[in-house]
């Protein structure tokens, strides 16, 4: 779910000081085969803002807070999202009926991205931490930057910041 409160940085409060609002410009979503963390409409007039946004991405890539208290808070957030989608969006209810047909015979056939609320309520913390370590690794992530900037400079910034991250010794492929 959303890692907006990364372990190293106070991400959400800082982003809001530059006009990047939580929910509208700073958010995340999970589909059947990817999780996307998004920072949008960040003002790039100041070089420092670009650097700070890259630091936010770096924080998300390896310093997610998986302490029990934070996990339990997110369980509540997931429940609220599930409830809102079920009561307010016919599209969500339709997808719950259509997805098993669309994905018949695949590993996605019986699982919606938001999950089963019984599992959300009862999974052991260790299971989530193990899953995170297995699949939410920097070597399985991509960074997409869109805007009016010098591409070569941006590539150098990304390589300098993210190139320091060590690869996992036993990746789960």
Question: Which stretches of residues belong to each language-model region?
Answer:
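Acidic/histidine-enriched alpha-helical segments
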Residues: 13, 64-83, 150, 169-173
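An aromatic/glycine/proline-enriched structural segment found at the starts
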Residues: 142-173
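Solvent-exposed loop/turn segments at secondary-structure junctions
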Residues: 43-46, 85, 149-151
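M16/MPP (pitrilysin/insulinase) zinc-metallopeptidase core fold and M16-derived inactive scaffolds
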Residues: 1-40, 110-114
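M16/insulysin-pitrilysin zinc metalloprotease superfamily fold
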Residues: 39-74
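Scaffold signal of the M16-like zinc-metallopeptidase fold and its non-catalytic homologs
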Residues: 2-3, 28-33, 49-56, 60, ...
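Short cationic amphipathic helices and targeting signals
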Residues: 36-39, 137, 141-147
């Amino acid at each position: 779910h959303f890692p907006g409160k990364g372990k190293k940085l106070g991400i959400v409060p800082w982003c809001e000081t530059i006009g990047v609002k939580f929910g509208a410009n700073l958010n995340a979503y999970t589909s059947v085969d990817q999780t996307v963390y998004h920072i949008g409409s960040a003002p790039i007039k100041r070089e420092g803002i670009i650097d700070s946004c890259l630091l936010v991405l770096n924080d998300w890539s390896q310093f997610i807070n998986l302490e029990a208290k934070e996990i339990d808070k997110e369980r509540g957030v997931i429940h609220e999202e599930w409830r809102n989608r079920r009561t307010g969006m016919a599209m969500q209810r339709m997808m719950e009926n259509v997805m098993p047909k669309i994905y018949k015979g695949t590993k996605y056939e019986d699982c919606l991205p938001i999950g089963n609320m019984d599992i959300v309520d009862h999974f052991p913390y260790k299971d989530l931490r193990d899953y995170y370590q297995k699949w939410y690794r920097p070597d399985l992530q991509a960074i997409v930057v869109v805007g009016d900037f010098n591409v070569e400079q941006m590539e150098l910034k990304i390589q300098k910041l993210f190139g320091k991250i060590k690869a996992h010794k036993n990746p789960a492929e």
